[in-house]
Protein backbone atom coordinates (compact mmCIF):
# COMPACT_ATOMS: atom_id res chain seq x y z
CA UNK A 1 0.00 0.00 0.00
CA UNK A 2 1.44 3.37 -1.05
CA UNK A 3 2.00 6.37 1.18
CA UNK A 4 -1.01 8.24 -0.19
CA UNK A 5 -3.22 5.19 0.22
CA UNK A 6 -2.17 4.98 3.88
CA UNK A 7 -2.83 8.70 4.28
CA UNK A 8 -6.20 8.26 2.58
CA UNK A 9 -7.10 5.41 4.94
CA UNK A 10 -6.04 7.51 7.94
CA UNK A 11 -8.01 10.50 6.65
CA UNK A 12 -11.14 8.42 6.01
CA UNK A 13 -10.98 6.74 9.42
CA UNK A 14 -9.82 9.57 11.69
CA UNK A 15 -10.23 12.99 10.12
CA UNK A 16 -13.14 12.74 7.67
CA UNK A 17 -15.84 11.99 10.27
CA UNK A 18 -14.93 15.08 12.31
CA UNK A 19 -14.73 17.31 9.23
CA UNK A 20 -17.99 15.87 7.87
CA UNK A 21 -19.74 16.47 11.18
CA UNK A 22 -18.70 20.12 11.12
CA UNK A 23 -19.48 20.71 7.43
CA UNK A 24 -22.84 18.98 7.59
CA UNK A 25 -23.93 21.79 9.93
CA UNK A 26 -23.03 24.34 7.25
CA UNK A 27 -24.72 22.34 4.48
CA UNK A 28 -25.79 18.73 4.76
CA UNK A 29 -25.94 18.44 0.96
CA UNK A 30 -22.64 16.89 -0.20
CA UNK A 31 -23.31 18.01 -3.78
CA UNK A 32 -22.74 21.62 -2.65
CA UNK A 33 -19.11 20.74 -1.89
CA UNK A 34 -18.82 18.73 -5.10
CA UNK A 35 -20.05 21.71 -7.15
CA UNK A 36 -17.89 24.21 -5.26
CA UNK A 37 -14.67 22.35 -6.06
CA UNK A 38 -14.52 23.20 -9.80
CA UNK A 39 -15.70 26.74 -9.04
CA UNK A 40 -12.63 27.25 -6.84
CA UNK A 41 -10.47 25.60 -9.53
CA UNK A 42 -11.88 27.96 -12.17
CA UNK A 43 -11.24 30.97 -9.94
CA UNK A 44 -7.58 29.94 -9.68
CA UNK A 45 -7.00 30.82 -13.35
CA UNK A 46 -7.78 34.55 -13.19
CA UNK A 47 -6.33 34.68 -9.68
CA UNK A 48 -2.92 33.64 -11.05
CA UNK A 49 -3.05 36.36 -13.70
CA UNK A 50 -4.72 39.24 -11.89
CA UNK A 51 -4.34 38.77 -8.14
CA UNK A 52 -1.31 36.65 -7.28
CA UNK A 53 0.07 33.15 -7.81
CA UNK A 54 -0.26 32.54 -4.06
CA UNK A 55 -3.99 33.31 -4.21
CA UNK A 56 -4.27 30.87 -7.11
CA UNK A 57 -2.46 28.16 -5.13
CA UNK A 58 -4.81 28.71 -2.20
CA UNK A 59 -7.85 28.37 -4.48
CA UNK A 60 -6.53 25.11 -5.93
CA UNK A 61 -5.86 23.84 -2.41
CA UNK A 62 -9.43 24.82 -1.47
CA UNK A 63 -10.74 23.00 -4.54
CA UNK A 64 -8.85 19.85 -3.55
CA UNK A 65 -10.07 20.13 0.04
CA UNK A 66 -13.68 20.47 -1.10
CA UNK A 67 -13.24 17.41 -3.28
CA UNK A 68 -11.83 15.49 -0.33
CA UNK A 69 -14.79 16.29 1.95
CA UNK A 70 -17.82 15.79 -0.30
CA UNK A 71 -17.77 12.02 0.04
CA UNK A 72 -17.23 12.25 3.78
CA UNK A 73 -20.25 14.54 4.13
CA UNK A 74 -22.32 12.16 1.97
CA UNK A 75 -21.42 9.19 4.18
CA UNK A 76 -21.91 11.14 7.42
CA UNK A 77 -25.35 12.44 6.43
CA UNK A 78 -26.47 9.20 4.77
CA UNK A 79 -26.76 10.96 1.40
CA UNK A 80 -24.53 8.68 -0.65
CA UNK A 81 -26.20 8.42 -4.06
CA UNK A 82 -25.50 7.41 -7.65
CA UNK A 83 -26.08 11.04 -8.66
CA UNK A 84 -23.48 12.23 -6.15
CA UNK A 85 -20.97 9.66 -7.39
CA UNK A 86 -21.60 10.67 -10.99
CA UNK A 87 -21.26 14.40 -10.22
CA UNK A 88 -18.11 13.83 -8.19
CA UNK A 89 -16.26 11.83 -10.84
CA UNK A 90 -17.40 14.12 -13.68
CA UNK A 91 -16.58 17.38 -11.91
CA UNK A 92 -13.22 15.97 -10.77
CA UNK A 93 -12.22 15.75 -14.44
CA UNK A 94 -13.29 19.37 -14.97
CA UNK A 95 -11.28 20.46 -11.93
CA UNK A 96 -8.27 18.45 -13.13
CA UNK A 97 -8.45 20.20 -16.51
CA UNK A 98 -8.59 23.60 -14.79
CA UNK A 99 -5.56 22.76 -12.62
CA UNK A 100 -3.64 21.92 -15.79
CA UNK A 101 -4.78 25.16 -17.44
CA UNK A 102 -3.26 26.96 -14.46
CA UNK A 103 0.01 25.10 -15.10
CA UNK A 104 -0.03 26.47 -18.64
CA UNK A 105 -0.69 30.01 -17.41
CA UNK A 106 2.19 29.60 -14.95
CA UNK A 107 4.56 28.97 -17.87
CA UNK A 108 4.76 25.19 -18.12
CA UNK A 109 5.35 24.16 -21.73
CA UNK A 110 2.08 23.26 -23.50
CA UNK A 111 3.31 19.80 -24.55
CA UNK A 112 4.16 18.94 -20.95
CA UNK A 113 0.74 20.17 -19.82
CA UNK A 114 -0.95 18.09 -22.54
CA UNK A 115 1.05 15.00 -21.54
CA UNK A 116 0.15 15.45 -17.88
CA UNK A 117 -3.52 16.18 -18.57
CA UNK A 118 -4.12 13.43 -21.12
CA UNK A 119 -2.49 10.81 -18.91
CA UNK A 120 -4.31 12.23 -15.91
CA UNK A 121 -7.64 11.78 -17.69
CA UNK A 122 -6.84 8.23 -18.81
CA UNK A 123 -5.86 7.04 -15.30
CA UNK A 124 -9.36 7.49 -13.79
CA UNK A 125 -10.96 6.17 -16.96
CA UNK A 126 -8.97 2.95 -16.57
CA UNK A 127 -10.09 2.69 -12.97
CA UNK A 128 -13.73 3.20 -13.93
CA UNK A 129 -13.50 0.70 -16.79
CA UNK A 130 -11.67 -1.86 -14.68
CA UNK A 131 -14.16 -1.53 -11.85
CA UNK A 132 -17.08 -1.82 -14.29
CA UNK A 133 -15.54 -5.18 -15.22
CA UNK A 134 -15.45 -6.25 -11.58
CA UNK A 135 -11.81 -5.45 -10.77
CA UNK A 136 -10.44 -3.45 -7.83
CA UNK A 137 -8.19 -0.85 -9.45
CA UNK A 138 -7.88 1.75 -6.68
CA UNK A 139 -4.31 1.94 -5.44
CA UNK A 140 -2.81 0.59 -8.67
CA UNK A 141 -0.08 2.80 -10.09
CA UNK A 142 2.32 5.51 -9.02
CA UNK A 143 0.27 8.64 -9.72
CA UNK A 144 -3.31 8.43 -8.55
CA UNK A 145 -5.29 11.63 -8.16
CA UNK A 146 -3.80 12.51 -4.78
CA UNK A 147 -0.25 12.23 -6.05
CA UNK A 148 -1.07 14.14 -9.23
CA UNK A 149 -2.72 16.92 -7.21
CA UNK A 150 0.26 17.27 -4.88
CA UNK A 151 2.57 17.33 -7.91
CA UNK A 152 0.53 20.11 -9.53
CA UNK A 153 0.57 22.20 -6.34
CA UNK A 154 4.33 21.68 -6.01
CA UNK A 155 4.99 22.55 -9.66
CA UNK A 156 2.91 25.72 -9.38
CA UNK A 157 4.58 26.78 -6.13
CA UNK A 158 8.07 26.17 -7.53
CA UNK A 159 7.24 27.96 -10.80
CA UNK A 160 6.80 31.19 -8.85
CA UNK A 161 10.50 31.12 -7.93
CA UNK A 162 12.19 28.98 -10.57
CA UNK A 163 10.41 28.08 -13.78
CA UNK A 164 13.18 25.78 -15.03
CA UNK A 165 12.95 23.61 -11.93
CA UNK A 166 9.16 23.58 -12.27
CA UNK A 167 9.49 22.45 -15.90
CA UNK A 168 11.79 19.60 -14.87
CA UNK A 169 9.36 18.54 -12.15
CA UNK A 170 6.42 18.77 -14.57
CA UNK A 171 8.29 16.63 -17.10
CA UNK A 172 8.95 14.01 -14.44
CA UNK A 173 5.30 14.12 -13.36
CA UNK A 174 4.17 13.61 -16.97
CA UNK A 175 6.40 10.54 -17.29
CA UNK A 176 5.11 9.13 -13.99
CA UNK A 177 1.49 9.71 -15.02
CA UNK A 178 2.06 7.75 -18.22
CA UNK A 179 3.83 5.00 -16.29
CA UNK A 180 0.66 4.83 -14.19
CA UNK A 181 -1.43 4.47 -17.36
CA UNK A 182 0.77 1.56 -18.44
CA UNK A 183 0.68 -0.02 -14.96
CA UNK A 184 -3.10 0.05 -14.91
CA UNK A 185 -3.46 -1.24 -18.45
CA UNK A 186 -1.10 -4.13 -17.73
CA UNK A 187 -2.88 -4.94 -14.45
CA UNK A 188 -6.38 -4.84 -15.97
CA UNK A 189 -5.38 -6.84 -19.05
CA UNK A 190 -3.63 -9.41 -16.86
CA UNK A 191 -6.64 -9.80 -14.58
CA UNK A 192 -9.03 -10.13 -17.53
CA UNK A 193 -6.90 -12.89 -19.07
CA UNK A 194 -7.35 -15.10 -15.99
Curated annotation (Swiss-Prot):
- For this entry, list what GO says about its biological process: phospholipid biosynthetic process
Swiss-Prot/TrEMBL keywords: Cell membrane, Lipid biosynthesis, Lipid metabolism, Magnesium, Manganese, Membrane, Metal-binding, Phospholipid metabolism, Transferase, Transmembrane, Transmembrane helix
Q: Where does Mg(2+) 2 bind?
A: 67, 88, 92
From the UniProt record, which GO molecular function terms apply? Answer: magnesium ion binding; phosphotransferase activity, for other substituted phosphate groups
Which pathway, per its entry? Lipid metabolism; phospholipid metabolism
> Where in the cell is the protein located?
Cell membrane
Its EC number is 2.7.8.39
The GO cellular component terms are: plasma membrane
Give the catalytic activity.
CDP-2,3-bis-O-(phytanyl)-sn-glycerol + 1D-myo-inositol 3-phosphate = saturated 1-archaetidyl-1D-myo-inositol 3-phosphate + CMP + H(+)
Q: Pfam families attached here? A: CDP-OH_P_transf
Active-site residues from the entry: 92 (proton acceptor)
Cofactor binding note: Binds 2 Mg(2+) or Mn(2+) ions per subunit.
Cofactor(s) for this protein?
Answer: Mn(2+); Mg(2+)
What HAMAP family does this protein's entry cite? AIP_synthase
The protein here is known as: Archaetidylinositol phosphate synthase
